[in-house]
Amino acid sequence: MKIFGIIMETNPLHNGHSYFIKKIKEIYQPDVLIAITSTSFTMRGDISVIDKFTKTDQLLDAGIDIILELPFTLALQSADYFAKNAIEILNGIKITDLVFGSEIDNYEFYDKCLNIINNFNNYDNKFSKKQ
C-alpha cells in the first residue's frame, strides 16, 4: 500500500496547491494521500486568513484523503523545524513516501545547499578569520 505524506502550508489553498495534489495523484497513484498542515496560525506566527476547519475542507475538496494538524507549538518554528516536526509525525503513522514541491527544479542546487549547511562550521571559520 502506498501511503504518501505531504506537508502543506495553505494560507489559503490556491491553484498551485491544487495542481500539485492533482499531479501527485496522477503520477504516483497513492492509495492514501495524507497532508499535515498548520493550525489557524501559520509557521510564521501570523493568523491564517482562513481557520483550520475551512483549511481542512479545502484540502479534502482538493483531493487529500486525511488531514493532520501540526500542533501549534510545533508549527510556530523556523522552516527547518516546521518540516522536521511534520516529518516526525508523518513517519510515526508509517507513510511510505514523502512528496513535496519546490520552486527550483535543480537538484544540484539543493545538494550544494545541503553541503554548505552540513559543513557550516568550516565555512564559518574560513570566512570569520582575518586575512
Region locations from a protein language model:
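Nucleotidyltransferase catalytic core that binds NTPs
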Residues: 1-131
